[in-house]
Amino acid sequence: MERSLAITALGALAQTTRLETFRTLVRHEPKGVPAGELARMLDVPQNTMSAHLATLSRAGLVTSERQSRSIIYRADLDGLRELTLFLLKDCCGGSTELCAPLIAELTPCCASEVEKS
């Protein structure tokens, strides 16, 4: 990930509603959430939510897909992965024992899904 895109992504997440929107979308993967439902869930006017979703989309953190009359939004997990890797690149000066606790914290969220595959 380029530094400028990382700055854009971090800037997009540096706002309360956008951060909560992104976290909500991550929790609802892979199904996604319609825009109107997101607005209701977070008690935000629909036009405001639309602007926040556009910002997250431009930052490479959210994707959308039209399904019938709704637009379904999803967290872009590839974008999240790239941002996380950008932040952790060259972690701990190459001392794997220092990074091990961090890796262990990140692994449990998806371990059961990986085991099912």
Language-model features, listed with the residues they occupy:
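Amphipathic alpha-helical dimerization/coiled-coil segments
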Residues: 1-5, 26-27, 77, 81-117
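N-terminal helix-turn-helix DNA-binding core of bacterial DNA-binding proteins
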Residues: 4-45, 71-79
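Alpha-helical residues within the helix-turn-helix
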Residues: 40, 57-58
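Short, hydrophobic-biased segments on the C-terminal half of alpha helices
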Residues: 53-54
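Beta-hairpin "wing" of winged helix-turn-helix
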Residues: 58-67, 74
